[in-house]
């Protein structure tokens, strides 16, 4: 029975992986967009993390996670005799399937190794597989999703090295050194999860110093390779050994310095120290958070998650996705209720919670952004695109169209200023604009992409006269919710929810204006 349930949950995970929700711009701009610009001819946008004087993001972990699959896909594309570049949307879906696969294989495999009891293992695997976090965040291209897998496998390797039944732990120690450096260059928060589990290695290193030597050498070589790749990426000239010695680019160090300054974190939002504990963790775990408090199961997994939670709470910028590595660790460290009635109640609440959050985050959350970019890439007349009240769209999905199309992200712009921009950029209205599809033959076109719930636009959309701006709806995607437009203060709770949910969707309008003859 549990195997059929698990298989069903795996298929649900795949279904969510193939849904175009957009959880945060970082899932694109801190990974796929960077590497896509290196492998393909897609014009891309590098964010401040990669363009500042002291860059804080490493490309070292991006190459094995995203670069190798892209190179393989490119090789297969050329090998099949296809002309031109691979459509970016094909690369996008390939990466989603890849994230599903490594989550399904590596995350679940790690749980099998970390949990000795078959009964408890089945419960833990089913809890993790039925979590909306696994369905959504873990199937998206976040560095946090990669960190989840690296933390889990670091615990597996620590367990193997510390196992007294192992005749030799040289291989496990060597791999642990490589994985640990990979984890640090992926996210500097990674060591926080190994503070307590790492203590298990001290007696092992005392008894078997060879394992310490192997771990140190592997970590040192991997560090040199990582710094070399980053230095080659960020320095404009060809890298020499002199550059690596005298002006290396050490991104984890830059990242730590940046995040240690409160004035830097203030640009992204400051939170109280307890935000992770009372806000983000219950949001990720749902009703399982109560069981974690009432019936925890002490294990190395629990201590790893707790140490990560404590260290991350010391930083003032706290987002829920920063705690992704703790989710499988916490879910595998709880005991199910013994009372049958309580068990059934928990199961019902758990299923309802994950179905609700899974649908919200996995289907509707900014769900029209990716399809919207694909739509714009197919519009021959599009030269200006203004995105209002949405997340920043992935530029590389335009398939080279952005050589001619200027994308403007004006998410928080006031409505009056938006109209000013549209008035400046809108093309002149012609009879062709009023006939079906004739406008596509024009050389220039201005498009506004905004949520259907943006009621501020309503008075202007119905203009059919000769004066002012004209908005012609040319595309609509229904499965889109804009949670950043919840104005409870002005509209009240129920009116706001009715507007955002009732008028869900993302719309593209072609904007023109009356011009003097």
From Swiss-Prot:
Gene behind the chain: SMP3
Pathway(s) served: Glycolipid biosynthesis; glycosylphosphatidylinositol-anchor biosynthesis
Pfam families linked: Glyco_transf_22 (PF03901)
Gene Ontology cellular component list: endoplasmic reticulum membrane
Family, as annotated: Belongs to the glycosyltransferase 22 family. PIGZ subfamily.
Biological processes annotated in GO: GPI anchor biosynthetic process
Main location: endoplasmic reticulum
Keywords: Endoplasmic reticulum, Glycoprotein, Glycosyltransferase, GPI-anchor biosynthesis, Membrane, Transferase, Transmembrane, Transmembrane helix
PANTHER family tied to this protein: GLYCOSYLTRANSFERASE, GPI MANNOSYLTRANSFERASE 4
Transmembrane region(s): 59-79, 86-106, 175-195, 209-229, 274-294, 343-363
Topology of the protein relative to the lipid bilayer: Multi-pass membrane protein
Subcellular location: Endoplasmic reticulum membrane
Protein's UniProt name: GPI mannosyltransferase 4
Protein's job: Alpha-1,2-mannosyltransferase involved in glycosylphosphatidylinositol-anchor biosynthesis. Transfers a fourth mannose to trimannosyl-GPIs during GPI precursor assembly. The presence of a fourth mannose in GPI is essential in fungi.
Glycosylation sites: 339, 444
GO MF: alpha-1,2-mannosyltransferase activity
Keyword flag Repeat: no
EC number of this enzyme: 2.4.1.-
Keyword Cytoplasm among UniProt keywords: no
Domain of life: Eukaryota
């Amino acid at each position: 029975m549990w195997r059929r349930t698990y298989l069903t949950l795996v298929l649900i995970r795949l279904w969510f992986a193939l849904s175009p929700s957009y959880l945060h711009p970082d899932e694109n701009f801190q990974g796929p967009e960077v590497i896509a610009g290196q492998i393909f001819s897609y014009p891309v946008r590098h964010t401040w993390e990669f363009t500042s004087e002291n860059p804080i993001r490493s490309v070292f972990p991006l190459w094995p996670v995203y670069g190798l699959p892209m190179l393989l896909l490119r090789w297969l594309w050329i090998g099949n005799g296809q002309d031109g570049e691979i459509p970016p949307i094909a690369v996008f879906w390939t990466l989603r399937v890849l994230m599903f696969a490594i989550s399904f294989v590596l995350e679940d495999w790690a749980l099998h190794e970390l949990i000795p009891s078959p009964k408890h293992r089945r419960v833990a695997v089913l809890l993790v597989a039925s979590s909306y976090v696994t369905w959504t965040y873990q199937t998206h291209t976040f560095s946090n999703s990669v960190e989840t897998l690296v933390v889990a496998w670091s615990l597996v390797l620590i367990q193997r090295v510390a196992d007294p039944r192992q005749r030799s732990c040289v291989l496990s120690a060597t791999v642990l050194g490589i994985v640990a450096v990979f984890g640090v260059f992926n996210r500097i928060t990674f060591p926080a999860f190994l503070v307590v589990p790492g203590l298990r290695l001290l007696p092992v290193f005392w008894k078997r110093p060879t394992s310490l030597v192997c771990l140190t050498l592997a970590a040192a070589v991997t560090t040199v390779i990582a710094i070399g790749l980053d230095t080659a990426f960020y320095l404009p000239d060809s890298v020499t050994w002199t550059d690596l010695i005298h002006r290396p680019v050490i991104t984890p160090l830059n990242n730590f310095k940046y995040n240690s300054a409160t004035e830097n974190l203030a640009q992204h939002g400051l939170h109280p120290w307890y935000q992770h504990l009372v806000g983000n963790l219950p949001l990720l775990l749902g009703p399982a958070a109560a069981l974690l408090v009432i019936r925890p199961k002490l294990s190395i997994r629990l201590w790893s998650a707790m140490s990560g939670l404590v260290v991350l709470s010391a930083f003032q910028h706290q987002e829920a996705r920063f705690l992704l590595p703790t989710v499988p660790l916490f879910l595998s460290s709880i005991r199910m209720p013994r009372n049958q009635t309580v068990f059934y109640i928990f199961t019902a609440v758990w299923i309802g919670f994950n179905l609700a959050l899974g649908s919200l985050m996995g289907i509707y959350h900014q769900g029209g952004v990716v399809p919207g970019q694909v739509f714009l890439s197919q519009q021959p007349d599009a030269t200006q695109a203004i995105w209002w009240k949405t997340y920043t769209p992935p530029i590389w999905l335009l398939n080279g169209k952005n050589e001619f199309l200027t994308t403007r992200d004006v998410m928080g712009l006031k409505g009056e200023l938006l109209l000013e921009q549209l008035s400046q950029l809108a093309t002149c209205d012609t009879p062709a604009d009023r006939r079906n599809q004739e406008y596509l033959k024009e050389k220039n076109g201005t498009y506004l992409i905004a949520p259907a719930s943006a009621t501020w636009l309503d008075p202007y959309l119905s203009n059919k006269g000769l004066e002012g701006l004209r908005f012609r709806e040319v595309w609509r995607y229904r499965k889109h919710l804009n949670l950043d437009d919840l104005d409870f203060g002005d509209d009240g709770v129920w009116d706001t929810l009715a507007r955002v949910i009732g008028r869900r969707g993302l719309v593209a309008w072609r904007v023109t204006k009356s011009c003097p003859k």
